[in-house]
């Protein structure tokens, strides 16, 4: 491709998605390309690109690359969970077209609002009269540079596809999700959250497995749904894990404000549970959207585990009882002790059944298998235990029992005998009790059943009742531990009290958790059991019919109406014992009981599925043990009139006793209670065995209760009732109701049918004789009581009733026509309820539903009863207000929905609707009379309200009524009347009030009814009137939230309930353990959803009606909807209420709005619809007009509230689409849509409306905007927070939002110019609000957004170049954009402690703008925080620099008055006084921090102020005194010299404030470079140290990822006068002077590098680099950026001099440190090592000769080459070196830690004298001459007569004596508390009361004493008028 073609690019018609299939790495071969064009980059295989341009020859592409973060970025930038996670970044790259594979089928969604701004976008906003160019055009024309904001030269490139996954499917979303997880894995590892890190890794692999299976279509449809649900659940866990890592770090004051989770990674979003697609606003129900969000956010494993049952999973028929459960059981993995290799089971039988603690629930399933248990367990079929009653599950724990028995062979060689049988003299051995029978066939048995082990497990957790839907339809695995019976004590046990002894009592002991008599059999230790609940009869039958493995159905043990009940008897054997013999005295090992019957039709079995047997051998036990085995006896109907069971008892296999037991006698089955004892006789017909047994009969043929028999024989046809017969009937009926439920249940159908016949017969007889008889009432009363007894709380009888009802309805059974009779009796009782109410009435309320069913079923089509009178009687009853009757009213209301449903086939639906209206109207009237909605309620009243609204909910959900009510084909007035009345009933509980007591549970049912009406009833009239309810609902929301807060409902909880419950009380759902401290107020969420649904109706069904006023006018003729709840007109109060509601929506203290972003987006969209409905009203009724009087009527507070909530919604986190990650962005947009477009439209309309009637044509022509008014100005100036919100809104990446905000900002600026003639007030208003936006973390900028905003602002601004307004605009823009630039830069600084200094520096720049904007308090607060921080660290120099910086903000103005401030605490005073005070404190802290040079500089500034501004002589005296003290102290101060380092930062791991920049750092005294390395590595985590300058140059050329630091030592550059000669001065003074000069103006440093080619020091040339810093040291943060670098060459001699000076300075520092350590009595061991090493290296260096090598320059052969002056300087340097070396050697001798080192010291002295002999001699000679000269000068001064008073003056000032008035400083009492007095009183008093010698100075500052605590302590008094009075009087 030619160069010309390469520069020509053609845009594609759309963004094209592609993936690189080959890496393109241009920078590997040509790294310099990166400097030619930033689009050149290395692009690797797999890169995701979006092409937007192609070259002309189609060979090259330019595209966006989704640049994923590298691991180094996480390590470099992540320090805590608060830090912003590195995300995908768009980068424009160039690559060959052939390297990419395009996937054109993947559509890329581009949003028009992301477009780049252009002039065309702003033309509609500019006045047509405008004659000037835009700012953008002006800059473009006036500049020859290519300005980014100028006119585009080609078609702008499309925006980056932020919504690239908007139209992708669920499985396509898995890719970015996995990429996101990998980012989180890196981030969690980087911040040390290793537990979350490991969980994230597991999530990654789980999701990747699901992605693979879905992508490859490796699933069935059912599996696909399960995988999608699992993936949805895992995605939600990601958000929860991330949320759990969030910690509220206590950041220091100058840290960058952080908006937690800016990307929405913690966001919870609702998905379709079957497809996995995100739910949307347009398609899905809002109730589903919010409920799914709540379940995802609060529960574990949703939607994998269902939490709420669907509508069709509820009770299938509430009329006939709840759905029963069945339990599916499967046995696996019988385990034995590892010590046993083979348990050797013998004909093992396994018995399984269910029971509670007290009763057996099912028959047992028994199966006998071979000894090979590996195959035996596989052969055992699964067991289905059917029809477990719900009442049993609710009241008891359900246990699964497994019993293992084996059949073993026994030997019959050992006959039973007694070990020690006492025989009297009269008796013989023939009297032994053990005498076998002579029968040859039955006298012995060779096999017995022995109990091996048994186990019990509580399986209650598998029932949905206990754990909800999380366990429904899911099998649970249990490990069932097996135990055996320990019968060692049974031999000595003879008491009959313990029935649980031995094998038969083992199960009870295990249940009771008793260890007595329980052991472990190593042959059977445990068993694995799988248990699953099957709900409903149909599901159970489905399992049986579709299972691929055999399943046995096990019936119940009790009399169950759902099974075909065969006649049967259950026989259970208890304890068996020897009669009169202790078991321990016998050799009996086993007792076996066998039963049989001579009647061959009588059979025995364990359950009805087993093969029947003519006899049954029970398990063998030892004497005194319980057998505990139950069997079933069948063939009861074939028994003789008298029937017995034959009982045989074998002892050790020998038949020793037998007897017959009656089981039937005189045609009655004999039942034996538990514990009944029978004596079994021996062959000698004497009792030998005591046997306990229990026999229970289950059947209805025998043992019928006499009362039932008497009732069934009552005549029902052609009966003539006399008084005696009436009494007989009455007594019989009452006796019947006294029969036990168990007996009544067996004959329930017969009794019920006979009762109906009896009702008909008695009624007919009464009709013939007249109404005087009371028998019909008695019969009806007893009938109702019978129904109440049998049907109210009993499931079995309801099933019988159901069967009877079905037979009647199918005409299989003829039923007497008792309908009129039943209705008449009930009507009569309800009519009389106001005067008398009996138990019969209560029974009717309990059973009215069943009575109505009987009435409907028994009525003939031509004789349908008239229900109207009956309905009216019910209405009367419900009007009663008596508290006792309310319980019966509740029962009646509960039955209404099912009752009406039953009547739908026999009554007109319209009649039922009228009845319902009347019923609820009666309830409503009673509630209003009793003021139920405005006072606390009793428990009964609450139950009543809940029942009423639950009834209403069920009613509108009943299919027949719903079909009628939802029919929209015709307009039916009754239908609309019912709906309008329903809305009134629902809205009444919401009636607002200040002290309103809301009944939350009732309101939740109200909400359920309300949402059902909104969702299912689509009448236009209804829906448009629902919109009129919005103001009322908003008001209700405000009051309800206030009540919830007052009632403490807005607190974190560990449980929650489903939204819109179907019944109260609700089922509580536990919160996931990952989730902490979430507040969810369900009732508020429900009401918010209702409001959202209605706003959705307004926007979708009535889009052409854009205001409340239009909707209200549309509903004028809707007479049914004109109650007080509906708005008839909109008022200011309505608008205030709506804005308050929107504000509370986003206050979000009632649900986790920052996490449930989908719900927040929904509330945002609904809020904007609400506000848009109010817009027309506000504009029409609250806009200004040309007259000033009308402007006064404008409610600016209303405008402020309205605009505030618009911006609140628009600036919410859920509205920041580009800030969100890819999936949250997609989810939010599906719900919220383009919110900002609506917001921008409303804001534009409002802004223009505020200028209604005000149009400035001049401004329109010159500046492009003419609609300007004082109202606009007042709105934003009096509510300046709106300016902040406008700026935040402007920086959203949305063209409409930005351009409208720019219009408003430009208009606001024009208003400022129009009113003030200056833009400085605009700066004062904008800058603080921008800072406020930054502080709260909402003003988050990047380079592109700032550039975009500037472009839009320049397109909007129109100012003629020659206009006086132009310079003001430029100044305004300079301040505004400068501040925004700082905000932009500060967000590039990572939020880690290591970058605090960079952040502080940026904050200081930021506060300079705030100072200019007349907002110094923020700056003051920051400086004060810094000061306190440094004082606490005892870093007095940094504290002083902070105060100096603060003092610089004040002018030397003594005529103004400043208000008192809190930070720092300063009184009311002038600017001069405040600045003076701060400078003095700064100087004091400089002195305390050993920086007297800085203190001198401060005092010199004060001298200038005192001398030139206010002529304060006292101040001058004080300052000069301080300066004199400092100069004096400088001559004797011992202080340590810090080390300085040049530090360079390279790599993209550093922010721009550090990257590729160099600084000079002030280190610690004598700090080694390795120590600086360690400190920097600790501060800048993850950094690498670079050691060579060559590496630094390479890194600067090609910056890599990561962090790289280079450190080099630098030395301060001294600037000493050439006239300064140290030879005549003491070396100690010379050292102090040198330190003074060095620290006086320290901002220049140097280091050097050797040049190659030198052979020795005399020809060694070096390059010296001099670094100039921005600030003078000491400086804030102990560092300053290098702003200038100069390079120069040093000759060999200059290098020698420089090296000597450096060494001298180093030795001076060591000397000072030693002196200071000795003075402070510190540890000298480490110091001695450092001193010894340095002296040794100086005197006699082992390598290169050390310092002595520089003497070569003084040799005659070499000295000729250099000038005499330079050689003189070298000589002086050697002299000074000798002096300091001598002192150091003296210190070395003093510091010797032991005498053993004295020889080493002597050697050093000797070497010193040898190597520096010439210098020592010269220095000694010079020193002697200097001493003689000085002595002569002092003598001359003493005897001089020129100044006789000098000595007196000296003594008079500095030698003050007690009692004299010389130089006395007088302080008045009133002057001692001013700010200046504080300083003078502290400093001058001490100065004048002590001598001026250095003894008055301590080590920490100018004077001794405690430091001032003015900043951290109390505030001084503010008496500024006091003057210090000095009286310097001297005596003669």
UniProtKB/Swiss-Prot annotation:
Gene Ontology terms describing biological process: autophagy of mitochondrion; intracellular signal transduction; small GTPase-mediated signal transduction
UniProt KW keywords: Cytoplasm, Mitochondrion
Region of interest: Disordered: 1908-1932
Recorded GO CC terms: cytoplasm; mitochondrion; plasma membrane
GO molecular function: guanyl-nucleotide exchange factor activity; small GTPase binding
Pfam families given in the database record: C2_DCK_4th, DHR-2_Lobe_C
Record-annotated DOCKER domain positions: 1410-1824
Gene3D superfamilies named among the record's database cross-references: 1.20.58.740, 1.25.40.410
Subcellular location per the Swiss-Prot or TrEMBL entry: Cytoplasm; Mitochondrion
Compositionally skewed regions (Basic and acidic residues) per UniProt: 1922-1932
Family per record: Belongs to the DOCK family.
Additional observations: Present with 238 molecules/cell in log phase SD medium.
Function: Forms a transiant heterodimeric complex with LMO1, that acts as a guanine nucleotide exchange factor exchange factor (GEF) for the small GTPase RHO5. DCK1, LMO1 and RHO5 relocate to mitochondria upon oxidative stress and trigger cell death. The DCK1/LMO1/RHO5 signaling module mediates mitochondrial turnover under nitrogen starvation conditions via mitophagy. The DCK1/LMO1/RHO5 signaling module plays also a function in cell wall integrity signaling.
Name assigned to this protein: DOCK-like protein 1
Organism: Saccharomyces cerevisiae (strain ATCC 204508 / S288c) (Baker's yeast)
Underlying gene: DCK1
């Amino acid at each position: 491709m030619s160069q010309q073609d390469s520069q020509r690019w053609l845009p594609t018609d759309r963004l094209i998605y592609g993936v690189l299939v080959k890496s393109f790495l241009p920078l590997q071969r040509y790294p310099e390309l990166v400097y030619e064009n930033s689009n050149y980059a290395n692009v690797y295989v797999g890169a995701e690109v979006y092409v937007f341009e192609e070259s002309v020859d189609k060979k090259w592409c330019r595209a966006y690359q989704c640049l994923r973060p590298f691991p180094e970025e996480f390590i470099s930038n992540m320090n805590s969970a608060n830090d912003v996670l590195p995300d995908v970044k768009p980068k424009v790259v160039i690559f060959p077209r052939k390297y990419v594979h395009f996937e054109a089928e993947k559509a890329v969604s581009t949003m028009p609002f992301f477009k780049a701004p252009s002039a065309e976008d702003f033309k509609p906003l500019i006045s047509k009269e405008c004659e000037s160019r835009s700012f953008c055009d002006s800059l473009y024309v006036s500049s020859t540079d290519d300005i980014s904001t100028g006119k585009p030269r080609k078609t702008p490139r499309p925006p980056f596809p932020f919504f690239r996954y908007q139209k992708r499917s669920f499985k396509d979303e898995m890719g970015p999700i996995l990429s996101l997880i990998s980012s989180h894995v890196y981030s969690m590892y980087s911040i040390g959250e290793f537990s979350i890190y490991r969980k994230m890794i597991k999530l990654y692999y789980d999701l990747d497995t699901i992605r693979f299976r879905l992508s490859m279509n490796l699933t069935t449809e059912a599996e696909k749904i399960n995988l999608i649900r699992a993936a949805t659940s895992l995605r939600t866990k990601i958000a929860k894990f991330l949320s759990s890592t969030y910690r509220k770090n206590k950041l220091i004051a100058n840290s960058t404000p952080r908006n937690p989770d800016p990307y929405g990674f913690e966001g919870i979003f609702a998905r379709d549970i079957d497809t996995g697609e995100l739910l949307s606003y347009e398609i899905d129900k809002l109730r589903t959207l919010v409920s799914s969000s709540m379940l995802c956010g609060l529960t574990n494993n949703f939607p994998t585990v269902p939490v709420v049952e669907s509508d069709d999973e509820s009770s299938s028929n509430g009329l006939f009882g709840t759905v029963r459960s069945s339990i599916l059981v499967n046995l696996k993995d019988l385990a034995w002790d590892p010590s046993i290799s083979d348990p050797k089971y013998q004909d093992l039988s396994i018995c399984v059944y269910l029971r509670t603690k007290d009763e057996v629930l099912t028959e047992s399933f028994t199966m006998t298998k071979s000894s090979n248990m590996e195959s035996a367990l596989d052969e055992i079929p699964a067991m289905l235990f059917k029809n477990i009653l719900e009442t049993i599950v609710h009241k008891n724990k359900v246990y699964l029992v497994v019993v293992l028995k084996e059949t073993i062979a026994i030997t019959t060689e050992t006959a039973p005998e007694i070990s020690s049988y006492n025989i009297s003299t009269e008796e013989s051995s023939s009297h032994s009790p053990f005498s076998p029978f002579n029968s040859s066939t039955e006298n012995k048995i060779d096999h017995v059943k022995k109990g091996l082990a048994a186990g019990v497990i509580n399986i209650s957790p598998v029932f949905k009742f206990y754990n909800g839907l999380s366990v429904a339809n899911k099998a649970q695995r249990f490990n069932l531990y097996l135990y055996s019976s320990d019968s060692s004590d049974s031999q000595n046990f003879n008491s009959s009290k313990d029935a649980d002894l031995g094998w038969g009592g083992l199960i009870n002991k295990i249940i009771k958790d008793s260890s007595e008599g329980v052991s472990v059999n190593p042959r059977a230790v445990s068993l694995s059991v799988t248990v699953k609940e099957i709900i409903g009869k149909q599901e159970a039958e489905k399992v049986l019919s579709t299972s691929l493995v055999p399943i046995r159905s096990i019936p119940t043990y009790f009399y169950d109406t759902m099974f075909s009940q065969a006649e049967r008897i259950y026989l259970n054997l208890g304890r068996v014992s020897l009669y009169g013999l202790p078991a321990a005295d016998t050799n009996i090992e086993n007792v076996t009981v066998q039963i049989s019957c001579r009647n061959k039709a009588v059979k025995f079995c364990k359950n009805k599925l087993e093969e029947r047997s003519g006899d049954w051998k029970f398990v063998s036990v030892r004497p005194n043990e319980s057998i505990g085995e139950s069997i079933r006896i069948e063939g009861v109907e074939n028994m003789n009139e008298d029937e017995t069971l034959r009982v045989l008892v074998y002892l050790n296999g020998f038949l020793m006793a037998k007897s017959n037991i009656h089981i039937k006698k005189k045609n009655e089955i004999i039942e034996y209670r538990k514990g009944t004892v029978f004596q079994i006789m021996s062959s000698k017909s004497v009792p030998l065995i005591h046997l306990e047994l229990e026999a229970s009969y289950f059947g209805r043929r025998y043992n019928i209760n006499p009362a039932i028999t008497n009732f069934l024989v009552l005549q029902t046809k052609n009966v003539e009732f006399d008084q005696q017969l009436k009494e007989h009937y009455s007594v019989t009926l009452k006796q019947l109701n006294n029969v036990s439920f168990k007996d009544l249940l067996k004959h329930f159908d017969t009794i019920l049918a006979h009762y109906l016949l009896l009702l008909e017969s008695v009624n007919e007889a009464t009709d013939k004789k007249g109404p005087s008889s009371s028998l019909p009432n008695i019969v009806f009363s007893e009938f109702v009581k019978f129904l109440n007894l049998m049907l109210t709380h009993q499931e079995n009888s309801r099933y019988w009733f159901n069967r009877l009802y079905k037979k009647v309805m199918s005409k299989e059974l003829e039923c007497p026509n008792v309908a009129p009779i039943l209705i008449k009796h009930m009507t009569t009782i309800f009519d009389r309820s106001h005067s008398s109410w009996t138990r019969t009435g209560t029974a009717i309320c309990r059973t009215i539903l069943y009575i109505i069913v009987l009435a409907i079923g028994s009525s003939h089509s031509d004789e349908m009863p008239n229900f109207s009178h009956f309905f009216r009687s019910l209405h009367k009853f419900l009007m009663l207000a008596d508290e006792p009757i309310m319980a019966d009213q509740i029962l009646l209301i509960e039955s209404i929905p099912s009752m009406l449903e039953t009547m739908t086939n026999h009554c007109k639906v319209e009649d039922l609707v009228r009845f319902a209206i009347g019923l609820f109207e009666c309830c409503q009237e009673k509630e209003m009379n009793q003021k139920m909605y405005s006072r606390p309620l009793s428990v009964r009243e609450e139950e009543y309200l809940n029942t009423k609204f639950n009834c209403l909910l069920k009613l509108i959900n009943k299919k027949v009524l719903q079909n009628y009510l939802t029919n929209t084909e015709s307009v039916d007035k009754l239908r609309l009347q019912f709906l309008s009345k329903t809305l009134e009933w629902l809205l009444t509980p919401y009636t607002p009030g200040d002290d309103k007591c809301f009944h939350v549970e009732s309101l939740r049912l109200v909400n359920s009814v309300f949402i059902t009406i909104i969702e299912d009833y689509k009448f236009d009239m209804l829906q448009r009137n629902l919109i009129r309810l919005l103001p009322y609902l908003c008001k209700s929301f405000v009051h309800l939230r206030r009540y919830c807060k007052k009632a403490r409902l807005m607190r974190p909880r560990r449980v929650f309930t489903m939204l819109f419950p179907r019944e109260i009380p609700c089922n509580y759902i536990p919160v996931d353990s990952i989730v902490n401290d979430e507040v969810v107020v369900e009732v508020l969420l429900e009401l918010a959803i209702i409001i959202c649904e209605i706003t959705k109706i307004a926007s979708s069904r009535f889009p052409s009606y854009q205001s409340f006023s239009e909707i209200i006018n549309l509903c004028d003729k809707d007479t049914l909807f004109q109650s007080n709840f509906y708005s008839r007109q909109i008022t200011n109060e309505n608008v205030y209420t709506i804005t308050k509601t929107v504000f509370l929506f986003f206050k979000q203290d009632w649900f986790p709005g920052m996490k449930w972003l989908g719900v927040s987006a929904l509330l945002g969209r609904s809020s904007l619809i609400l506000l848009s409905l109010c817009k027309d009203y506000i504009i029409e009724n609250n806009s200004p007009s040309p007259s000033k009087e009308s402007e006064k009527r404008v409610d600016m507070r209303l405008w402020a509230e309205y605009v505030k909530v618009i911006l609140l919604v628009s600036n919410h986190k859920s509205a920041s689409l580009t800030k969100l990650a890819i999936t949250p962005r997609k989810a939010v947009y599906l719900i919220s849509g383009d919110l900002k477009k609506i917001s921008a439209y409303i804001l534009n309309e409002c802004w223009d409306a505020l200028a209604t009637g005000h149009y400035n044509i001049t401004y329109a022509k010159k500046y492009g905007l003419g609609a300007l008014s004082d109202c606009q100005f007042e709105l934003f100036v009096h509510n300046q927070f709106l300016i902040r919100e406008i700026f935040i809104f402007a920086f959203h990446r949305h063209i409409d939002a930005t351009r409208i905000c720019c219009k408003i900002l430009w208009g606001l600026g024009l208003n400022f110019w129009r009113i003030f003639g200056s833009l400085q007030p605009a700066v004062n208003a904008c800058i603080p609000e921008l800072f406020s936006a930054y502080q709260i973390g909402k003003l988050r900028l990047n380079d592109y957004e700032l550039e975009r905003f500037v472009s839009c602002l320049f397109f909007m601004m129109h100012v003629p170049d020659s206009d006086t307004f132009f310079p003001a605009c430029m100044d305004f823009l300079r301040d505004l954009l400068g501040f925004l630039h700082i905000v932009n830069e500060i967000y590039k600084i990572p939020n880690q402690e290591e970058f605090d200094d960079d952040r502080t520096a940026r904050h200081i720049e930021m506060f300079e703008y705030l100072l200019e904007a007349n907002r110094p308090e923020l700056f003051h607060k920051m400086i004060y925080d810094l000061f306190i921080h440094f004082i606490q660290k005892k870093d007095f120099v940094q504290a002083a620099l902070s105060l100096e910086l603060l003092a610089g903000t004040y002018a030397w103005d003594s005529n103004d008055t400043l208000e008192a401030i809190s930070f720092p605490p300063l009184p009311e005073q002038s600017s001069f006084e405040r600045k003076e005070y701060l400078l003095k404190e700064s100087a004091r802290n400089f002195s305390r921090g050993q920086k007297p040079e800085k203190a001198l500089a401060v005092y010199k500034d004060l001298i200038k102020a005192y001398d030139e501004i206010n002529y304060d002589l006292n101040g001058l005296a004080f300052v000069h005194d301080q300066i004199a003290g400092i100069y004096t102290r400088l001559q004797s101060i011992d202080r340590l010299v810090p080390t300085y380092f040049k530090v360079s930062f390279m790599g993209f791991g550093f922010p721009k404030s550090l990257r590729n920049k160099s600084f000079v750092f002030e280190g610690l005294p004598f700090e080694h470079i390795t120590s600086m390395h360690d400190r920097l590595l600790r501060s800048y985590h993850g950094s690498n140290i670079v050691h060579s300058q060559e590496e630094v140059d390479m890194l600067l050329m090609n910056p890599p990822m990561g962090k790289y630091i280079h450190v080099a030592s630098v030395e301060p550059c001294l600037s000493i006068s050439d006239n300064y000669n140290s030879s005549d001065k003491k070396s100690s003074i010379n050292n102090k002077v040198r330190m003074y000069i060095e620290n006086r103006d320290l901002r220049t440093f140097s280091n050097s590098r050797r040049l190659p080619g030198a052979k020795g020091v005399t020809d060694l040339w070096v390059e010296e680099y001099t670094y100039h810093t921005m600030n003078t040291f000491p400086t804030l943060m102990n560092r300053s950026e290098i702003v200038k670098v100069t390079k120069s060459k040093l000759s060999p001699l200059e290098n020698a001099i420089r090296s000597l000076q450096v060494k001298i300075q180093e030795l001076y520092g060591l000397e000072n440190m030693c002196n200071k350590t000795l003075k402070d009595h510190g540890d000298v061991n480490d110091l001695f090592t450092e001193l010894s090493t340095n002296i040794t290296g100086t005197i006699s260096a082992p390598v290169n000769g050390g310092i002595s090598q520089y003497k070569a320059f003084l040799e005659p052969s070499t000295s000729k080459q250099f000038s005499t002056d330079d050689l003189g300087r070298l000589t002086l340097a050697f002299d000074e070196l000798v002096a300091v070396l001598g002192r150091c050697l003296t210190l070395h001798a003093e510091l010797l830690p032991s005498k053993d080192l004295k020889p080493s010291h002597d050697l050093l002295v000797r070497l010193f004298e040898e190597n520096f002999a010439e210098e020592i001699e010269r220095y000694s000679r010079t020193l002697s001459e200097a001493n003689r000269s000085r002595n002569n000068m002092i003598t001359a001064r003493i005897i001089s007569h020129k100044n006789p008073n000098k000595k007196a003056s000296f003594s008079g000032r500095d030698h003050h004596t007690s009692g004299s008035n010389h130089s006395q400083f007088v302080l008045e009492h009133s002057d001692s508390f001013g700010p200046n007095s504080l300083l003078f009183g502290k400093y001058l008093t001490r100065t004048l009361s002590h001598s001026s010698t250095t003894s008055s100075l301590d080590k920490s500052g100018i004077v001794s004493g405690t430091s001032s605590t003015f900043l951290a302590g109390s505030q001084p008094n503010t008496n500024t008028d006091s003057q210090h009075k000095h009286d310097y009087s001297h005596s003669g």
